[in-house]
From Swiss-Prot:
Keyword Coiled coil included in the entry's annotation: no
Transmembrane segments: none
InterPro entries associated with the record: SAM-dependent_MTases_sf, UbiE/COQ5_MeTrFase, UbiE/COQ5_MeTrFase_CS
Reactions that this protein is recorded to catalyse: a 2-demethylmenaquinol + S-adenosyl-L-methionine = a menaquinol + S-adenosyl-L-homocysteine + H(+); a 2-methoxy-6-(all-trans-polyprenyl)benzene-1,4-diol + S-adenosyl-L-methionine = a 5-methoxy-2-methyl-3-(all-trans-polyprenyl)benzene-1,4-diol + S-adenosyl-L-homocysteine + H(+)
Pathway(s) where this gene product acts: Quinol/quinone metabolism; menaquinone biosynthesis; menaquinol from 1,4-dihydroxy-2-naphthoate: step 2/2; Cofactor biosynthesis; ubiquinone biosynthesis
Keywords, comma-separated and alphabetical: Menaquinone biosynthesis, Methyltransferase, S-adenosyl-L-methionine, Transferase, Ubiquinone biosynthesis
Gene coding for it: ubiE
Enzyme class: transferase
GO biological process: aerobic respiration; menaquinone biosynthetic process; methylation
Descriptive protein name: Ubiquinone/menaquinone biosynthesis C-methyltransferase UbiE
GO molecular function: 2-methoxy-6-polyprenyl-1,4-benzoquinol methyltransferase activity; demethylmenaquinone methyltransferase activity
Family: Belongs to the class I-like SAM-binding methyltransferase superfamily. MenG/UbiE family.
Length: 251
């Protein structure tokens, strides 16, 4: 690549300049923030609650721990972690998108969750936290939207304490051909129509379907985590691999 030539990346199936992707992703989430929780329930038939509950169960969160809920959006995981870490613990709900962060803050405060939760607008590629700060980091359905995933994983590793755990919950690749066919049909034909009906925004849900297909598969993401410095990395497929939970440790 010659000097001055723009580097490119993907935004769904489109090729865009690297410095434009964050702005485009921001536009998607500004558009859907107000109806994000409703769409999650509708498009996953409520199964996202099971995926998130399993993530919480394997997190090992205990009273007094510091947890970073990265790309935490409307705060589903933060709400659970707040209860688990208690008054002596701390949960940081971080998201690059201020619209999502505002929805999350309002939702949690309306539930009376205020004492041990703070809110930070942050870019996963350059987290504004000290080294070795958190016991647990989660990023649920957010990594695929990050422009430089390798940089983000290294940043997470930096702010995680030795002995700490990273949990990456993300859409992945179905394991069986019949499921792949059904999933593709649903994603590209049904999902955008749901988006249009509920949020008046079909394009954002077309991007969702495309971004899932462009995201690294289970084994590729596992190796990316290893390359970023995580150890004992493994993953669990859920719903035939439509979603996978990756786990890695910092020692």
């Amino acid at each position: 690549m010659s000097e001055g030539e723009s580097k490119s990346t993907h935004f769904g199936y489109k090729t865009v300049e690297v410095d434009k992707k964050a702005e485009l992703v921001a536009g998607v989430f500004h558009s859907v923030a107000a109806k994000y929780d409703i769409m999650n329930d509708v498009m996953s038939f409520g199964i996202h609650r099971f995926w998130k509950r399993y993530t919480i169960e394997v997190s090992g969160a205990r009273p007094g721990m510091k947890v970073l809920d990265l790309a935490g959006g409307t705060g589903d995981l933060t709400a659970k972690f707040s209860h688990l870490v208690g008054d002596k613990g701390e949960v940081v709900l971080a998201d690059i998108n201020d619209s999502m962060l505002k929805v999350g803050r309002t939702k949690l405060r309306d539930k009376g969750i205020v004492n041990n939760v703070s809110y930070v607008q942050a870019n996963a590629e350059a987290l504004p936290f000290p080294d070795n700060h958190f016991d647990i980091i989660t990023i649920a359905f957010g990594l695929r939207n990050v422009t430089d995933k390798d940089a983000a994983l290294r940043s997470m590793n930096r702010v995680l304490k030795p002995g700490g755990k990273l949990l990456v919950l993300e859409f992945s690749k179905p394991q069986h051909e019949i499921m792949r066919k059904v999933y593709d049909l649903y994603s590209f034909k049904v999902l955008p129509k749901m988006g249009e009906l509920i949020t008046k925004d079909a394009d954002s849900y077309e991007y969702l379907a495309e971004s899932i297909r462009m995201h690294p598969d289970q084994d590729t993401l596992k190796q990316m985590m290893v390359d970023a410095g995580f150890e004992q990395v493994d993953y669990t497929n859920m719903t035939d691999g439509i979603v996978a939970l990756h786990r890695g440790y910092k020692f």
